[in-house]
Amino acid sequence: MTTREKDLQKGLRLLHLLHQTNPYPQTPGTASQRRNRRRRWKRRGLQILALADRIRSLSDSPTEEPLDLAVQRLQELTVEDLPNPPTSTPTAQAFTCIPPVWDQLVPRSNPSSNEGCERDSCEHRKSPMESSQKDSGSNHRDPQEDQTRT
């Protein structure tokens, strides 16, 4: 571990300790006492942040490694060869094939299947509550029944 990393670790430990020394204030007391405690807590927190900025700026000193070594490390980086792109262009037949996910979809206009009924479906499943209300002789009318009568 380099000295720069050690300094950075020491600074982080110091910041962690500073934040632990400023817990959120307790709740008992009158409203003005609680307000003053929160105000003092916030002011201490701002002071800790200012100290953290100063500590961080101290650790941003120039790196100890020479510029030649940094350039050498950059030169060692390589980019992997990418595979050649496909040369054939898509044809119109490629767009007409149906994806396998869509093969099992049943159109909504199929009256024999009520399994696929969802929110967007035209068909309407009746719940047991609706059927019991009709049996009790309620005055509510189903708009779909009105459409089928005409």
Curated annotation (Swiss-Prot):
Pfam families registered for this protein in UniProt: REV
Subcellular location: Host nucleus, Host nucleolus; Host cytoplasm
InterPro entries to which the protein is assigned, alphabetical: REV_protein
UniProt GO molecular function: DNA-binding transcription factor activity; RNA binding
One of the GO biological process terms: mRNA transport
Biased composition (Basic and acidic residues): 116-128, 137-150
Motif (Nuclear export signal and binding to XPO1): 69-80
Gene3D superfamilies assigned to the protein according to its UniProt record, in alphabetical order: 6.10.140.630
Record bears the keyword Manganese: no
Domain observations: The RNA-binding motif binds to the RRE, a stem-and-loop structure present in incompletely spliced viral pre-mRNAs. This region also contains the NLS which mediates nuclear localization. These overlapping functions prevent Rev bound to RRE from undesirable return to the nucleus. When Rev binds the RRE, the NLS becomes masked while the NES remains accessible.
Quaternary structure (record): Homomultimer; when bound to the RRE. Multimeric assembly is essential for activity.
Function: Escorts unspliced or incompletely spliced viral pre-mRNAs (late transcripts) out of the nucleus of infected cells. These pre-mRNAs carry a recognition sequence called Rev responsive element (RRE) located in the env gene, that is not present in fully spliced viral mRNAs (early transcripts). This function is essential since most viral proteins are translated from unspliced or partially spliced pre-mRNAs which cannot exit the nucleus by the pathway used by fully processed cellular mRNAs.
Protein name, entry field: Protein Rev
Native species: Human immunodeficiency virus type 2 subtype B (isolate UC1) (HIV-2)
Gene coding for it: rev
